[in-house]
Amino acid sequence: MSSASRLQNVNIVSNNYSRYGTSVYDKLYHSNGSGSNNAGKNSTTVGKLSSISQKSRSKQRHGSNCSRSMSQSPLSTFKSPLSNQNQSSAPDDLASIGQRRSDDVTSLDNETIITMNSRKSRIKKKYKSLISTSSKKFMNKLYDHGASSDSFSIFSLKTSHSGKHENSRFEKLRKRKYHAWGKFADINDLPVEIIAKILSEFELGRDQKTLVRCLYVSKKFYKATKIVLYRLPYFTSTYRVAQFVTSLRLHPDNGAYVKVLDLSHLKPGIIGQDSKDSQGLDDDGHSRRHRRRRRRSTNTSLNLPPATPTSTISNEDDANSGLIKDDASNGSEVEDLALAGWRDWRYRNEPLYSSPLLNSFKLKKVVSRSSSITSTSSGNSTGVHSTRRQRSNSSVASITTSIMSSIYNTSHVSLSSTTSNTSNGNISSGSNLSRVSTAGSLKKASAKSTRSSPQKAKPISDITSSSWFRMRLSSRNRKARTANTINLKNSKDKSDDDFKVLKHDSGHPSNYRSSTLKFSIEQPFSTHHPYANKFLLKYAPYKDLPLGYILHMLNLCPNLVELNLSNLVICTDFKLINQRSERRRMTSSLLPAVQESSVSAGPEKDLEIVYMTDSGKGYEYYEGLSKKHSRSSSLGTNPSSWIGGQANWTDYPPPIDAQTKTREEHRRNNTLNNKNVVLKKLNPFEIFEMICNRNEEKGGYCSLTKVKMNDIVWCRQYMVKYFVMRTFRQHLDYKSMENNSYERHLFSFRDSGLDRNFSWACNAKLHEFVALMVMDHLSNLDDLGLEELFNIKSEKLYIKNYCCRDPDILEISNLFDIRYGAGSEADATSDSNLEAESLQFRLTILKTEKPTSFWLTKVSKDYVSLVVKLCVDDDIDMDKMKVGKPTLRIDSITHNLISRLKELRRVDLRRNVGENNYYAESII
């Protein structure tokens, strides 16, 4: 074999021949003794071959469809240069080499075509991108070196997605910045206070529903929303105030969010009356429109009838309609519909007051139905005695029917505003659960009975009380309850986003309309204000609150900034004091005592009873407990009472009756700790005392800077004096008078007290109230007290000291004490054990040509100096000057005080002149 036949095929993919070595290049394209011409031709041939190989490589990347063209193109290109070479002067050995080269390429091309058609080649095509070939290595190096610097190239880092680009410089910088900066913060990364500030915009926009829905977003939103909701609670109903107090007692942490407590907008519970006094609204026509709109919105949201009772009789009988009007006029004497108050919440666990069948709405409904049925029966009867008998029977029947309908979940609309259909004689109602016969059907039944027996008309009360009617009514109610239970079981798996619809199909004719029951998922807005119990309806015109509720709120809200108790009426309350008494041990045991574990009856029932209004028991109940305890203690200490004949049956523990559910409840209500209870009547003075004690515990820091108590009669003068003076004393002890920190406190007692002409019954700051208290104290002194305080009788003995005094000084008083506390006034309660405190002052009155002004100065630790610069210019009208009402009152009191002092000096001078004349006459 020749050397050319032993050469291997080399695929040249680049013009960089140094990669393959010069020996291979010389053996392929250079022969021994060849000239420069042949070398140049061979170089061009090799260049063509390299370009052809690159084109074939680029075509090979596109897919299997172009494989045949790629295999045929090198054959033609290889033949053309070699044939040209053979036509020119070329050696024979080179021609033979080219001929074999073309044969080899053709054979390789045929093998490639056969391989591509095979099944193995088709499998390889799927994994072709994963195979690392020489061409792929070349392209990767091309990306790394040539195109990475060109941002507009398709091989740049911005457009390529190769594996090596992940480790490029840009990716490293990006990862470095990510680790340095971390994750981008969102709204949940903000502090709770900042989120609460953002959510407070909903409160400013009066969007309360959106604010409440923010409670269900996330935990951080829940905390922030609670801060906004509890910051300024708004109450118009005493029932909601009672709920709020119980909620704070169950969750004391929420009380720290309350900043403003406003109880000045409470309204009475009566609705439906047109009298302005009972509603407590404005005198304009807007109050009546607001009341109607409120009643209409309440009835619409609750699916209730209007507040005024509607007629339940068809309009065919004009005589009956006239009787309805007369009965409606008589029914106006009955109290109207009323909303629940704090007493309804207090007795919510009592069976007599907690039943929904006995609320004022059911009472209104029963009255309207009884009047309508009475008018129908009276139209059919003739005698007076029969009318009276039918009236009573129909009332009893209507009450029984309404209560039975309420038990079976009958809608209120079907009970109070049902109508009759006389065209087809069928009963039509608002719900298929309602099984109450309307007046039209009853009238039709009575007409049939009249035609069958014309001698005597059967009264409607007999129809409703017949055994057939009761049997028919019970069967229909049983079917309705069965259908309701089946539909409720079938609808457990059906849930929507907003509500669930339950359709009750009871198999009745088509004229029966199926009702729809909707369950709303908006829990905060699904419960409406309840109605008052009919036994508590007499308290509906009042808007009072027990004193214990106010003390609870002040105790549970330590961060109050503003307190508004204007227009508030306080109800009498008592504090429960448990007295521990030693019980005589009859036996002794060496075994350790076993403590009985108590069973919890619920979070609300486990709350400690601090005040009497915290429980559902009345004053007589606790008085009876104290009497029982006193008798049992006397029986244990007096030996003569141990005889069985002197023991009373009430001394023994009562048996557990059917109303007591568990023995734990019986044990809780009959323990010795509860029996030994002493009731102490609460005084409104404790409101001010609690505020001052809380400030004392905080080291003189008073967060409560605004107190409003306007138009209240329970606020007495000694209460206001104690509150003002003790607050001022705390500023003297813990703070400096130079920074004027007391000027931040703003108090308002406008038109309060039993006398509205009090000097302190106004709006003023703390230092203004102190000045008013001092001047009011001096103005209330008698003549002897003023003479002693201002040295009127003794100043002539110290004439030298008074002559050298500054002429601008009108009066200077001695030191005097102002006593404040529960025992400092004559109108204070005698049972108060709080000792009266005192604070020393000195008054200095200066004259000036400018408007009156004053200031307080702490001269020493012993007393405080009050300086009043009194305007003596009569041309200046203080009423027209821009001064506050406290300054005007101080100016008026000071002028009166100066006039009294001048009159006392004139009287003393006249007395002294008379004495001198008498002494001179006696000498002569």
Curated annotation (Swiss-Prot):
InterPro entries: F-box-like_dom_sf. Residues 274-286 have a biased composition (Basic and acidic residues). Residues 35-103, 271-328, 369-396, 414-460 are annotated as: Disordered. Residues 369-385, 414-434 have a biased composition (Low complexity). GO terms for cellular component: mitochondrion. One of its GO terms (biological process) is signal transduction. Keywords: Ubl conjugation pathway. Residues 287-297 have a biased composition (Basic residues). Residues 185-236 form the F-box domain. Residues 63-90, 298-314 have a biased composition (Polar residues). F-box protein probably involved in ubiquitin conjugation pathway. Involved in the resistance to ciclopirox olamine (CPO), a synthetic antifungal agent. This is F-box protein COS111. It comes from Saccharomyces cerevisiae (strain ATCC 204508 / S288c). The gene is COS111.
